[in-house]
Every structure is written in C-alpha cells, then in structure tokens.
Amino acid sequence: MSVYHRYASGEYDKTYFEKASESRKHDDKVGRIQISPLLGQFSTSDTLYKFKEKSIEEWLAIFPKAAYFKGYDESLFGNVIIMVYENSHTGKLNTTSFSKFGVTSYDNLVLDARSRFWPSCENLLPSYQKSNVRRSLAITNLKNYNKLVNSPGNFYVNKSWDETYAGSLANNMQLISEKKPEKFGLKLLELGLLQTHCIQSTVLDVIYDNASSETSDKIVEENNKLVFLIGSQLEQLFDPLLEYSPEIMEFSYTVPVDAISPQIKNNELINTIISELLTVQTNFTMRLVNLLQNFIIPLRIHVLAATSSSGITKINQVFPPTIDEITRINCILHDSLKKASAFGYVEIMKAVGTIMPYFYKAFIRHEANLKNFRDNLAKFHSKNNKKIFENTMINKGNLGIRDIDSIVAGSLLELPKLKLILVRLKDSIIFEKTKLSNFEDDPSNEFFTIEKYFNSAVDVIDAFGFEEENNQTKIDIRQRVFTPTGKILTELASNWPPELQYGWLARKVVGIYEMRNIKPLNDTFYDLDILIIFSDHILFLTIVDDSYYNERNNESMKNLCVSDILMHSLVNDKPLPNLKSLPTMEVNCWCIINEVITTTYKGVSPITSKTQEFLKFVNISKTGFKNNNAENSTISKNYEILDGSDRGNVDGCKIIELINKSTVLNKRKPFHLFRSNDPKLHIYSIAQELSAYQEESCKSPMALYLNLSIHDPKKYFEENQTVHFVLNASFINDHQIHMVGFNRAETFELNEIISSNDLQVCLKEVIVKNFSLLFNTFSNISKMLTQGYAYDINYCANIFTQIDEIKLNEHRQEIAKNKSTDSISRPKTRNVSEIISIPEVYMNKISPSNTNTRDQRSQQRRTEKRLSTRSKNNSRDVEVKKSSQERPDKRNSMIKKVFRSLRRSFDGIENSTPKTEIHENNNTSKLQDSSSFSGKKNEYTSLYKPVPQLQTKEQKHVHEQVQVQEQGQGQGQGQEQEQGQEQEKEQEQSFSEANIPRDIDNYTGIQMRKECNNSVQQSRNTSGSLDVNSHFEFPPHLDSSFGSNNNTIILVNDNENRHKNRPAPEKISILDSTDDHSSNIPRRSENVGYGKFNVEDFYDDGEANWVSISNENYSLLNAEIRALKEEAHMDTEDIIELNDSDNITEDEMRDVYESKDFDAFYTPQNQSVAQFGDNPTSLKNENREMSTQSLASSEIIEVFGKQIDSNFRSDYIPNLNENLHSINSNKKFGFQNDHRFSVLTSSDDEFFSSDDFASSLPIERQENKKSHSPMIMNSSSSDATIINENFEEKLLPATPIDCDDKVLPSSQIHKNMQSSSIRSDSFSTTYESMTYLSEILNGHLNFSD
C-alpha cells in the first residue's frame, strides 16, 4: 500500500493509535519509582509493601454502597473524612479514613467490648451507643491516633488526645449527603488519595573532583570509568519537534447519505474555482508524497539497516518527522475533497472546514523546524552528495537540493493559497445566489452551513499570522510580555508574575498542555488550566471565559486547542491570533522548576467515565506555589490529562520527563549529561566538577560523589539543605565498587561492595527505596505533604460538596447568551484591561499629539548639559509641534500605511538603502513635519531600562544636524569632538549600508575599527552559556583550535564580518533557532547600522534583560578610542589576533569565491547586504557640510593609508578557506534544534561521521590541525549561545580533552587554555600603527598639512 493510500484511508491512524493505546494499557508500575499515600503515620521503613491498594474496579464497586462522614478536630487531625462500607465477603464493616496525616484502612472492625479501642465507643452519645456505624467511627478515630503517636522520629503528637476526643469527634461527624456516594468516591480517586503514584524519570547530581592538586591520574581515570558505568552519554537532551506526533482525528468528513443538491447548479465560475482548489491541493499533496516515498523513507531504511544507532536521530534533524505529519493531513484532506467534489460546493466547504483545524498543530511544528532547515540540508548535501543524493537506490525520484527545499519549505505557502481560493469561492456563491434570489433573502440554511465551515477553515489559516488591530482598539503596551530586546512577545494572561517579566534571554518553552484542574479555586468552577513548562519555571494559567466552557461540549467540529495557539505564539514568535475561540486567561500559580515533584496515577474521568491518567504537582518549598492571592496558596495541585488531541502522544510520564529535562536545562554551571539504560526508569545523571556544584543554584534531592568521601553526613546535610540523599562510589579494584549512602532522616544507610557491572542496578534500587522513604518518613517534604493533604480533605468536605453544577451551567449559558447579544452590536475584542501590568516606573508614555515634541525634548536635555542651549531648542520645539499638527490627515494615513507595510515586510531589519544627506536650511521643517506620519497610536520611548530611542531615520539625521548647527561656536575641542562623534556615527552607518567592493584592501582600516568595536561590545554582552555540549566526553576536553580568554578581542577579515553582521535571513538561518530574540542580542549590537539604546544605567534590580550601549557614552568613536588606548598602552590582558596571510594565495582566494555554494552569500528579498562585486556608493563624494566633512573617516584613511599598508600589510590575503569553515561550523551550523525545546549541539560532526568530516577538510587544514589557530574562540560561548545575565565570568566548556592519550584534570586544562592565548607574532608589527591610530582618533594629530 502506498504512502498516500495508508494516510488517506485511515489505516495508518488505526494502526498507530491502537499500538500507542495498547502500550499504555499494558504498562505496569514494576521497575518505576512507586510512592504510596501517607498512611496515617511516619515510618522508618519502606511502607510501599504495607499499603494494600485496591484496583479502580474494586473501588468503583464499593463507592455506591458506602457512607461518607465528615468532621473537624481542632486539637490534632483537622478535617477528617471517613468512608464506611460493608465487606462483601465477611459482612462486617470496613472503614477508610482521610486526614492530613494520610489514608488509613481497617477491615472487619470489632465493634464490641472485645476491641481494645472500645473505650472510645463509651464516649458516644446515648443515641449513638447502639449504632455500629458510630462505633466504627469512634474506633477508627482512636486507632488513627494510636498509629500516629507511635510514629518514630522527632514528630510531636499531642499526648492528651485520648478516647474522649475520639468519641467526641465521632459524635460531631455529619453524613455527606450533598453529593451522590459514587460521585464523591470518584473525587477521592481524582485526587489520588487511594492510589499508588509513579515516577518514571528523575535527576541525579554526580560530583567529581579532577581539578584538585591532590587528584592523581589514577583518580581521574577511575572517575572516567565510573561516570560511564552510570549510563550512556547523551548527544542531545530532547527536542519534541523531532518526535513524530500526529494528531488524532476526532472529527472527519463523511459523504452524506441523503445528499441535497446545491441551489446553484452547473455554474461554470463556481466549478472552475472548485477545480482550481482541487488542483492546488493535489499539487502540494503529491509533491510531499513523492518526497517521502522516493527519498526520505528509503533513506531512513538505509540508515536503520546500519549498525550505528544514532543515524536515524541525525537524519531526523535534517528531515524532521513533521514532514510526515503535514503529508498525512494533506492526504486526508485530498481524499475528503475528492469525495465531496461529486456533491457540489456545500460539501466542499464541509470537507475543508472539518479537516482544516487539524492542519494547525502539524504546520506550527513544521514551521518551527524550518528555521534551520536550509542550513542543515546544505550541509547534509555537501557531505553526502555521492553516497545519498547520487545513489539511485535511495534517491529514487532524482530529487536535487532545490527540489527538496521547494517542497519542504514551500509547503507553508499552501494555506494562504487555499484561503484565497476559498474566499473567491464564497464570494462567487454569494454573488450567484443573489442573482438567483433576485436580491431577496434566501430562506434555506445552505448559506449558514457554508458560512460556518468557511469560518472554521479561514480562522485556522489566519491563526498562523495576525491581523492589524483596528485604530480604535487601544491596547496598553505595558500589558504585554517583553523579550530582552524590548519586543512584545505576546499577550498571555492577566496577573502575570513579575519574576517572569525578566529572564527571557535564557528562558525556553519546553511544553504547553491543556489539563483539567481537579481542585478549582473559586465558586465559578473554572477547571481548565494551561500548563506551561519553561526551562526555569512551571506556570499554570486558568481559562476564565464562561462562554468557552459553555461551548466546548456543544461543538460539532474541532476548535483550535489553546495550548497549540500558545505554543505557536511562544515558539514561532507570533502574536496571539484574533480568534473568537481564544478565551480569556489569568495566571493561577507558578514556581521554580526544581521546587516541584510530579507524580502520575490512574483515575476515572467524570467526563468520559473512562480510566484516565492524572498528575500531582507537589511544591517542596516552604511557601508552596506562588500566586497573586496569598489566601489561595496551595502545596499540591492535581490535574487530569485531557483525552483530546494529544491522545496517543502525551501521558503523565512524558510530562514528568519534560519537567526533569527542564531541571537539567536550568543548571547554571557546566556539566556532562548521562542517562541510564533502563527503559522503565530514566535517571538523568548530571556530572559536575566539585567547584561548579558548590556554586550551582539548581540541585537535585539526590547526589552521588565519585571518589569523594563524606566524613560527617549530619554536617553535610546542614550545609546542603536541598539534598535529602547522598551516595559515594569508589573503585576497590578493576571489577568491584564500594558504595556508601545516607539520607537526611537517618532512616537509611548503605555500605556494600558491588560488581562494577551492577552499578546501574544498585543505583536504581537505592533511588526507588529512598524516594518512598522521602515521602513517608518525617521530613521537610512530608511536612509539605501533610499541608497538601489537609487542603485536599478540606476541599472534598467543604468546597466540592457545595458546588451546584446545574445552576452553574445555567449561569454560564446566560452569560454566553448575553455576550452573543452584545457581539451583534459591537465587534468582539479581547479584554486586555487586566493583562500583564508592568510598573509605571519602567515606562515613559507619550501621547500621540506630542510624540515629536517629547522626542526632541529628550534630545535637548542631553544637549543642554554640554552647551546650555535650551532656549533655542524650546523655540524650535514649538515650530515642530505646529508643523506636526498642520499636516493633513489624508497624507498621514497614506504614509502610515506605507510605513506599516514596510515594517511588516522587514520585521525589525533596518532598511539598508544608502542614506541621503539633508541640509537643515532647506529640508529640516519638511522632515520634522513628516515625523507626524507615525499615526495616532501612542509611542513609547522606553520599555523598562535601558531606554531605547524610537526615532525614524529622518528624525535621527535632523537631530544630529541640529545639534551640530546649534553648537556653532562651541567650546573648542569639545565642539570638534562632538562633531567627530556625530560624523563618525553617520559615516559608519553609511558604510554599513553601502555595498562592499572586491578590493578589500582599500577598506582594511575601516574594517578593523568596526571589528574592534564589535568585539568590545560582544565581550560586554557575553557572560556565559547555558548550552549542554551534546558531543562532550568525560572528563572535559578542549580542542587545540579553541582557546578561552574572557577578555579576548578577535579581529577577523572582511568576509567574516560580512557573515557575522548579516541579519538572520528567513531562508538560510545562521542564528540560533531557539530563541530568535535572545540569540540576536550580541549580533545586533555588533551591527553598526543598528540603533544604539540610550541608557545611563541598567535595571533597578541590578539584572538587566539585555545589554545596551548609550549613544553618548558608548559611541562607535569612543569605543574605538578606548579599546585602542588599552591595547596600545598594554594596560589590559586583551589580545588582538591577526590572521596569518601565509596560508592562502591570491589565486586560491579567487578560487574560493568561484567555488562557493549558492547559499554562501544568499541575500533575502527586500534586504540589502554587502556583497562581493557590487559597486558601492562613494563615501567621499557625498554632499556634506564643511563642518562635518573635516573629520570624515575616508579622509582619515587617506592621510595614514600608507602607514596602514605598511604595518597592517595591505597585501594581506586572509585565509578565507579556513575562516569561512570556522564561521560555518561555529555560527551557521552550530545549532540544529529549537532552544525552547532542547539543548542544542554545536559540532561539525552533527549529521556525519568523523571520518567523513576529516575527509572533507582541505589538505592544508589537515596538516595544520594540531597547530594553534589564530582565531581564539570559546566553543561554549559563541554568539549563537544563550546569554545569562547571572554569569559573572565565562566558564570552561564541558568538552573532553585528550592530550597524548591522557586525560587531563581541569586545573591543567585551564592552564592550557590560558597558555593558548599567547599573543601572535603579528602583534609586534602592529603595535606602532595602533598607537598612531589612537592618536589620530583622539585628535592629537593635525591633518591640516
């Protein structure tokens, strides 16, 4: 059966989802961490085997026959619930009680004087003396106290609590009659009070010390062996985008049994449009099917047949499984359209409207995978052209790289094309129906059916982009989430936590899921929550839209899932779509990722009445989950995983594993990552140096020390409050390991000698046992559990019993009806009145009428400090304001539309058209008038701190020239220096926008100054990396081609700068695909055409989200002067490395350009990037005023050109072959996956073997591979890595080092890295020229001669 028929017939879905369902159904708890409920006491041993768990079927048989009583004990137990039921085998009474100390069960109670707990019955009221039910309550209470008082440890129990309290509590207990017994029992199952919970994955910290002077080579070797015995080293942590995740089809199109003919019959126009729709959709579908069937599937078969197990992972990185997902849904739509085409346009609309919602999730995942697709494909093609692309057994369709790219990337164009056709089809139907009805209303329901399904399809397509907001819609910009660059990320929910307004530079989105809250907080019973798993936090959003709850069960077709919409917005950096189905949300609670322990259990869903998976989140901090209302603070949260679109793909264990992986991502110090080989329990071992672990802020509750003894466990636990269990492992001989272990509660000790091959098995057994002890012995975690149990019991007894769901549903229907009535009179807009509130101190709001005036006043205040010319500026402000107000509205609207379209096209990329100088005498007023074309909306000149300047380019030129003119007869050297700064900035911008000629030598001076300044800014912006190096070994290894110096300034050739400063194109992304905004920070600051921020200081809290450079204090000229002064006077440790020109000849350089691939110098549409061979606009022939022409950079270059030629070697030909390779390996192909989902790799061996990589290197590069590279770079902190504002210094990369087949300790590694930073020979030849250049730029030399 072909790929198309398997997808279209549904045979594939049936097989896939049935297999997934069976695997979950037969998945048992054996081999996992099992946690029993608290059993009414704190035990010193493993209580798992003491808990007699009944199956869900047994409980379902008991609930209808049981009686539930509730009571409250002030002195000890608090809220108490007791379930009394008859034993079906013996006829005696059984009880199961619930309190904050857990669950206790007593079978076949003795209810007479033979019981030693009979004194409690003597304290019953006379009316209850003969009641066996009341006797069972009293005896159960006293037995609970007896278990609790006998708990070992430092647990204090009120000794005065006796049979009198037990009898009194039984007298006051009331029968729960508000809810049916079976419904109340189901709530107990939903809360997980009667079941054993499971954990399938956990995190273990592994600590070693290779850097100490006392560490011998033998210890280093043993550490190396031990860590590999723990598990397999991971090449990649995780990436959900690289996992096949089809969406189950809840609704599908079926051919009508009794088809009704459409009213418009045999219409040529409508039939033509339907034919076009089928043709377009068929073309997209068959191209995808051809790619899968004739290339990708044979390639996967070929790779799976090989011995290497990592090959399929590498193939999926190049050809992600999302290709299969979009092919599957296209085949389903194509088959539905073929069936519907025989019944006319109404059925065509039904087919499209029914299937189109399933395009959304597949396409947003596919769009996220396309960020680096072209780069990965080009690299894969260059390495495997002969083996794969020219192999007819694999490439059966003879597909080239351009063909594959057009099919995979071009698939995203399908949706907008389909929308255009659907709009034409609908308009044509309306037009023809109007003619047929003779302009009268049509009484049939045909048009309403068309409208319904048309809106369903178009809403999905529109959700991929966004519509421009109406000018009348006012949304406060403070009510949004900001990225570190100040760009609005998205509107999520109200009551946004302040701590999540920062840190977006390193934060990644790991997963988003829609779940049902078992314990809603308020009387409105909003029980749908959105779980967002970040790399550092977990966040719960509550849907608070009554109409959403009212409509969710009344839909005959699929609506877009809220979690999918949020994922598209956060992962693909898209604003939230303006959809009617998008509900209002508010923040429920949140916590740090390592403060939560998550377990999963089985229960019965009250919605589907089927067995479903549930999750329990327990916060182990002292304060519980954080929220905006202290009264609603909770310790635990229970959720049902909805049986919806992700069925077959997402279960509780997968979500728990994502949370544990996020804990790994949250590590602040370098580490090595290993995972156990047991499929039942995944133990992620994070190996860190002792010094790094001591400074680590995110620690696991369990720690394993390698060859490091712990002499005083009590003192150790006092110093490490987050650690609850510690192990030590050391070799006795080559085959035996000595294991020693302790826990904080002093209830566990281990001192055994095991075989080295049994290390993983021993670790698993010890971890499973200690997790059970952790939850059942008296500890800080069990204290938090008692508080969680107390809330659960109170919720069942006092909140759940008071909820009237019938009245609640009636109220919701009334609200939805009122909203629908209001929507007729006015269009529906999202309520953002309470969306994220940002403190006013961080905002400077400017009203529309004063936008230009405020902007100029801000510039005037800075000028006033230097020249005291405020009076002149104020008079000019009045003229500008008047001219702005006199501008006609019509022209304003037209220009606004032009700028809006440009902004939408460029999306933040500055227009690279060469600027034209404008003299103030003639054009100032006109330009200032044009600044009023910004529209009627508010303009904000600062978002938090630092304060960015929101100016048009024309305004910026005017302000610069006005300042120069006003300074006039300034104060001597200060005036000259200010003019030089303004002209230098203008000249640098013009240079960056001009096209660079072939003659690189003529611009060497300018290039070096730009690179020097860029390096200063880069070192200022880079403080470390959070990336896990995926291909490291143990212990750390450093390649000879890399160095580490935090203060190193790197100068590269002009070609490298061209690659480095190029903005991230849409088609070939050379930036980190993870967080577009985060990874662009250093690069944007390097781009001289990018406007600098005006800032005096950073955030008030001391942690800036991004680093900004002030125009006043950090201009290009000042940065150059400062850097060159430091280097010239040898007052810093910075090193300037110049590339050696002896490695390549001029002919070779020409050959390099001629042999470059088509994508090497690819320039996206509407983007001007410097290219080789272009004729630039002459810098010295531009019309400028005499006052600014005197310090032009081109004239400076002419004066000391000969000096630069002699000292900087103008005949120097850069080693482009080597440098381009470095750029490609470290920049372009360094990151393959999305940072929001995964820890990415940075390796040339990402998709290919080391042999293939070595064979692809030039001969010269292979011969000099061991020599020191003049490019001093750090693999763990490249421009594409994430920048963490918490880092104060650059850390050593977690990469292995092999030096003469001997593993070096970290101390020796650090020495080698420092020694590798020795200055090159070329530095001595450039010292004099730099001093000369510094004096020129400081104005100490006179050019008048």
Curated annotation (Swiss-Prot):
Low complexity composition bias: residue spans: 961-980
Claim: Plastid is one of the keywords in the record: no
Molecular function (Gene Ontology), one example: guanyl-nucleotide exchange factor activity
Keyword Zinc applies: no
UniProt signal peptide: none
Residue spans of biased composition, Basic and acidic residues class: 854-867, 874-892
Task performed by this protein: Co-assembles with BUD4 at bud sites. BUD4 and BUD3 may cooperate to recognize a spatial landmark (the neck filaments) during mitosis and they subsequently become a landmark for establishing the axial budding pattern in G1.
Protein name: Bud site selection protein 3
Species this chain originates from: Debaryomyces hansenii (strain ATCC 36239 / CBS 767 / BCRC 21394 / JCM 1990 / NBRC 0083 / IGC 2968)
